[in-house]
Amino acid sequence: MPSFYRNDGFTLIELIVVIALVAVLAAVVAPNLLGKASDANRKSAVIQLEKIASSVELYRLETGRYPEQLEDLVKRPTGVERWNGPYVRKLSLLKDPWGNDLVLRRPGENGPFEIVSYGGDGRPGGEGDDADILNWE
């Protein structure tokens, strides 16, 4: 009686070798990809801080004073004359690439204001991906 099923397949050794090769490739490639994402987030944050700092300066030029908080760039604060905003289109643009709120400090360490991203962990300080990013650095 002829058999319709073939017993051809992979041996256990062949499967183990393939799994080991995939694991080695993942171990080599994954850190490189994760490092690129971290660099991209930091570069994106730097560009974002520069743009928002320009918006803060425009706010000052038009109103005669610096905003009390970054949200003032999006929504007109009460009692502010000559507000011609929004200077930033929407509130979500006031978050860093990690989804944390940006912080406006007045006065700043190196000027009348500074805008800070607290990095990946969203807390002051840190190293690497968690290091703070300031608009004047």
What residue spans do the PLM features occupy?
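Flexible interhelical turns and helix-capping residues at alpha-helix boundaries
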Residues: 5, 38-41, 63
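Alpha-helical hydrophobic helix detector
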Residues: 16-32
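N-terminal leader/signal peptides at the extreme start of proteins
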Residues: 1-10
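Aliphatic-rich helix starts adjacent to a transmembrane/signal segment
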Residues: 32-51
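Short amphipathic alpha-helical interaction patches enriched in hydrophobic/aromatic residues
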Residues: 29-33, 37, 56, 60
